[in-house]
A protein has these predicted regions:
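Short acidic/polar alpha-helix capping motifs at helix-coil junctions
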Residues: 14-17, 76-80, 170-178
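Acidic/histidine-rich catalytic neighborhood of metal-dependent amide-processing enzymes
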Residues: 1-59, 101, 105, 109-111, ...
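Active-site-proximal beta-alpha loop/turn segments in soluble metabolic enzymes
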Residues: 24-27, 70-77, 167-172
Length: 193
């Protein structure tokens, strides 16, 4: 598009600003993007979708990393002393709603996706991605992670489970609700092609 307008200066158009950002899938590419300096009030993202595809909403997204600390004791003397972090990881994951995992959801249904699990008796780490189109349900998913960690700590002692939840990006529809003309303009332009 930029090349076309540069090659055809006789075609009238409003000011056009173009930016390239990396790391779109996790939203990190925009962390240091100076929106004010960029100068555009609104922007479209051109991505690798199919011809005629127009999307204006997406998941709210967060990552969650849970660390579990166990207590290793010789197996012959472990009764009432050993705390197996790998088993704590299993116990933690069992508190996540079973029907809210990617293999059981579709469309607008949000999910908890366990992407990585590593563990030993002394230490275990679970990594999840949390997704939901609805902001309230997204916040509830983060609360369930927190409550699962708190439950482990209540049972096995403070500091047994720790978590870091990091918001990655939000549903862009929230920002567009007062500017739906942008979607209509894009639809009209696509239909004219």
């Amino acid at each position: 598009m930029a090349e076309y307008f540069l090659d055809n200066p006789q075609i009238k158009h409003p000011d056009i600003y173009i930016a390239f950002t990396p790391d779109e899938e996790v939203g990190g590419g925009m962390d240091h993007f100076d929106v004010k300096r960029f100068g555009a009030k609104y922007a479209y993202t051109v991505d690798g979708g199919g011809i005629g595809e127009l999307e204006y909403e997406n998941f709210n997204a967060a990552s969650a990393v849970i660390e579990l600390t166990g207590q290793s004791v010789h197996p012959g003397e472990a009764k009432d002393k050993m705390v197996n972090a790998s088993r704590l990881a299993i116990e933690f994951d069992a508190q996540i709603p079973e029907n809210e995992r990617p293999e059981y959801t579709s469309g607008y249904e949000g999910f908890y996706h366990l992407t990585d699990m590593q563990g030993s008796v002394e230490h275990a780490v679970l990594k999840y991605i949390l997704r939901d189109h609805d902001r309230d349900l997204f916040e509830k998913k983060k609360d369930i992670i927190k409550k699962a960690a708190e439950s482990i700590n209540m049972e096995y002692g403070e500091g047994t489970a720790s978590y870091v939840i990091k918001d990655q990006y939000y549903n862009m529809k929230e920002k567009l609700e007062d500017a739906m003309f942008l979607i209509e303009d894009a639809k009209n332009a696509m239909e004219e092609l």
